[in-house]
Amino acid sequence: MIVPRYYEDLSVLHENTMPARAYFIPASKRMDNLVEHREESDRMQLLNGTWKFQYFNSIYDVQEPFFEKDYDTENFDEIQVPSVWQMAGYDTHQYTNIRYPFPFDPPYVPQDIPCGTYAYTFVYHKDENAPKAFLNFEGVDSCFYVWINGSYV
């Protein structure tokens, strides 16, 4: 395993995140404030699309530094983002109305909980009139780690 075990540390709720705030999308001009129109903002860049993906039966199976800047992802599978890997044929759905899908023993996480690694290449276009940029993930299901150009953020 190549990542810190934050997923078993109850003292770590977030790391390297911005303080909580009201949800809004910045824009250089006045626009409709409905969330359905957020893509119309010239200061929002969606990272939706086809990402490189690897599925593992356990986080302990992740041994390669897939997050390095020049890591070869040619043999990775591809998956649509946003999506749920269970809908793409990886693993099984975890919801159930019968019993909890894995043992409950906080803060410990079973070693056989599946995980996925994602890689995506994009170009960020800096806007001099909006000097701060934020990376926002909406819908990540559990603990996750982010690297940009090989650097942990």
Predicted features and spans:
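Generic detection of short hydrophobic beta-strand segments and adjacent strand-loop junctions
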Residues: M44-Q45, I79, Y120-F122
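Surface-exposed acidic, glycine/proline-enriched linker/cap segments
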Residues: R99-P106
